[in-house]
């Protein structure tokens, strides 16, 4: 069976405070990486779907994001199909 692979990038929406990103930036500066300015942190989810129709696969992944993978109140997501 053929599969469609999907990668979902989930990040905080602009304007939402990112304490983890701030902590990472502070730690990098403390390690001597002085050129690092603002840091935003997110997550990447890789999925393999038993689907041959890319349009159906994208629609299904979007539904997954809306229902579970992303908190759409504070997060945005981007889907990349392979």
Where is each model-derived feature located?
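Long, contiguous binding/interaction regions
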Residues: 1-82
């Amino acid at each position: 069976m053929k599969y469609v692979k999907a990668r979902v990038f989930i990040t905080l929406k602009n304007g939402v405070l990112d304490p983890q990103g701030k902590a990472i930036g502070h730690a990098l500066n403390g390690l001597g990486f002085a050129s690092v300015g603002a840091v935003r942190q997110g997550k990447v989810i890789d999925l393999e779907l038993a689907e041959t129709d890319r349009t159906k696969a994208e629609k299904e992944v979007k539904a997954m994001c809306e229902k579970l993978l992303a908190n759409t109140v504070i997060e945005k997501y981007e889907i990349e199909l392979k």
